[in-house]
Structures are given as structure tokens and as C-alpha cells.
A protein has these predicted regions:
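Structural preference for solvent-exposed beta-strand-turn elements
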Residues: 1-179
Length: 181
């Protein structure tokens, strides 16, 4: 197993053009990461599937503005601590397991409890593979009996540094570990 990549320094400014074909998983990750960036992120050729639109609605609920045109999508990120939302909000991941799981990494240090829901299909999927590692960082969750959606994340203002090894090779779990804030 290769040594882990450790990034000790924050990226001060990132201004590059990256060209990728429309892809659901990449598009969802772009929306979520753009919500964390400070300033405007632009994407052309973003796949505007129902899952990606659900991701855009999710960051809108968290206080991040967006603009969708025929040619591009803009996300107006406010930085890592830039989410501004009301108490008692619910984020609907619809049928997107990627959104339902990765959004938890963004909400790990949330101030107020946030409920995550999904459609019938997503509500049958086990979420422990992401709630367990995030719990080690200090987040708290209220899961239903089947350990699926709906769930509530309580987050933590006192996150812990942990050594976590992803044994199942899950791209979602790896992404989750990278984007938790």
C-alpha cells in the first residue's frame, strides 16, 4: 500500500482551466467543492442531471448562490466557513448516493442539526460507511433503525485529527475524508 498523501499547507489561490467531459460524479463533486471556494467557480459542460441539480439545490439551501445558463454553471462560494443557513433545514439528496454521502463531509462542523433525506431507493441504502469515519472526527449523527436516510447530522465545533484507513476502496469515502472541513 502506498504512503498516504499529506497536504500541510492551504492552497491560497487556484486559477486553472480544467476540461472534462460531463460526468455525474465529477459534476457533483465540483458543485460541493465550489461551494467551499471563495469567489466564483465556473463550469462548462457540467452534466445537469437530476443528481447534479439536487447538489446545486443543496448548496443553495446552505446559503450559496448559483446561476445556471445553457452554456455554464456558476457557483458563488463563500469560503470554508461561508455557509449561512437557518435552523431546522432539510437537504433532499433525491436519488444521489454521492450527494447524500459527500454532503456530510461539508457539514461535519455544522452549527445546527441538518436533516438529510432522499427518495425511496436512497433511503434503503446503508450510510454507516460514511457516518462511522466522520464520527471518529467528532461528528454526531442520528440514524434510523436501518442506518439509512433520513438521518440528522449534528456536526461538531471541536473536530479531532484522526488517522483513518479506507479499507473498502470506496471513492465516496475517500472523497469524504478529503473534503470534510
Amino acid at each position: 500500500m502506498p504512503d498516504p498523501l499529506i497536504i500541510n499547507d492551504k492552497i491560497g489561490r487556484f486559477k486553472k482551466v480544467i476540461s472534462v467531459s460531463g460526468d455525474k460524479s465529477i459534476s457533483i463533486r465540483w458543485v460541493l467543492l465550489s461551494s467551499l471556494a471563495k469567489g466564483v467557480s465556473n463550469a462548462k459542460n457540467l452534466l445537469l442531471s437530476e443528481d447534479v441539480l439536487a447538489a446545486i439545490r443543496a448548496v443553495n439551501i446552505l446559503g450559496i448562490k448559483s446561476k445556471i445558463t445553457k452554456k455554464e454553471v456558476k457557483i458563488y462560494g463563500k469560503g470554508i466557513k461561508g455557509y449561512n443557513y437557518k435552523k431546522n433545514i432539510t437537504i433532499d439528496a433525491r436519488n444521489s448516493g454521492t450527494l447524500g454521502r459527500l454532503i456530510l463531509g461539508l457539514l461535519i462542523n455544522t452549527t445546527y442539526p441538518i436533516k438529510i433525506i432522499g427518495d425511496n431507493s436512497l433511503s434503503k441504502r446503508d450510510f454507516r460507511r460514511v457516518t462511522q469515519p466522520l464520527s471518529k472526527f467528532g461528528a454526531q449523527f442520528k440514524l434510523n433503525k436501518s442506518k439509512s436516510l433520513p438521518l440528522t447530522i449534528f456536526g461538531s465545533q471541536k473536530l479531532k485529527s484522526v488517522k483513518y484507513i479506507e479499507k473498502k476502496g470506496s471513492a465516496q469515502c475517500k472523497s469524504l475524508s478529503l473534503i470534510h472541513i
